[in-house]
Amino acid sequence: MTENQDLCGSAQSESAENPRPSGAESDESGSEDTACAQAARSGEPSGAVSDDEQAACRLVDGCVRFDQGEPHRIVERVALEVPVSISFNGIYYNVLSCTPCDFEDIAYGVAYSAGFITSADDVRSVEVTQLTNAYQIDVILKTRGGFDYSSFMLSSISGVPIRDAEVRLPSYFPAHMVHIGPMSPIPPQAITAASNGLLERQGMHRRTGATHAAAFVDREGAFRFMSEDIGRHNAVDKLIGRLVRNRVDPLSGFAFLSSRCALELVNKLARYGIGVVATVSAPTSAVIDFALEANVTLCAFSRGNRFTVYTHPERIAIDCDGADDDEKRPVREV
């Protein structure tokens, strides 16, 4: 009996007949694994299942789905969630709960977001060790004079960065230190293309419904890189790590996130120098305030052929001359 076979006698598998919002992929893997892995990393859709994606999922037998009032026994594919410990130069940094794939990307991304590196050249090596029920990532960084990595240890209880066990570091990169270079406006069609194409490219989400995605999209709306993880922060860190490793110009496109428009996520992307961030869901006042000060163009509710620009609309190639008076007014507190 295949994993897509209904155990009560009918083929009611979610991946076969009732796909999650982003569709379903074939579970046939083999010679296409390498091509699929490359396609997944570049954001291209694929019918094959990569080795990374296979390792990041598990089959659960004995599930019961109620459909049209009728119960059906099925086998479901679920996303793996494992603890991953990261250390830098032999010093413990943090334990992440994440999807067990793309370890080098998340190592580079975390190092960049934490301010430990400014380019891929600052990393000497990344070693991944699989433990019984966890993973260990040991990152060796090229030393920078006067920089004390041990002062950036994380509290094992709260995960909040602390220095000398007393003075807390800022939880995000200060807006006044963000530098966004000049860039030509992004065509609005590129953002709607990303919105309409994201779910099609989320391989793990299509099979589990449990992952977030972070993508880097070019000015024509083509996906260049995409990362998935059960955690939205992990997905963004993996994307940043991939951009760092590939030395991608942050002004050559924009970031598109499947998650809520959270301050910490936009902050990490702005630190890399990305000037336009689009998300499928709502922003908060805090992220709007940060984006205004940091000179980041913030687009939210990016769904289908619609999106709302909250800050710095000059980076989107739109003409507001024909908009209603109410639409021309800047957003203000009431």
Q: Model-found features: residue ranges?
A:
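Intrinsically disordered, low-complexity regions enriched in acidic/Ser/Thr/Pro/Gln residues
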Residues: 2, 8, 36, 43, ...
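Intrinsically disordered, low-complexity terminal tails and inter-domain linkers enriched
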Residues: 2-56, 321-331
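Feature captures the catalytic cores and cofactor-binding loops of soluble hydro-lyases/lyases
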Residues: 232-321
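Noncatalytic linker/hinge segments flanking ATPase motor cores
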Residues: 125-129, 135-137, 167-169, 178-182, ...
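Protease-associated
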Residues: 211-246
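Short alpha-helix boundary/capping segments
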Residues: 98, 227-231, 283
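Active-site/ligand-binding-proximal alpha/beta "capping" segment
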Residues: 334
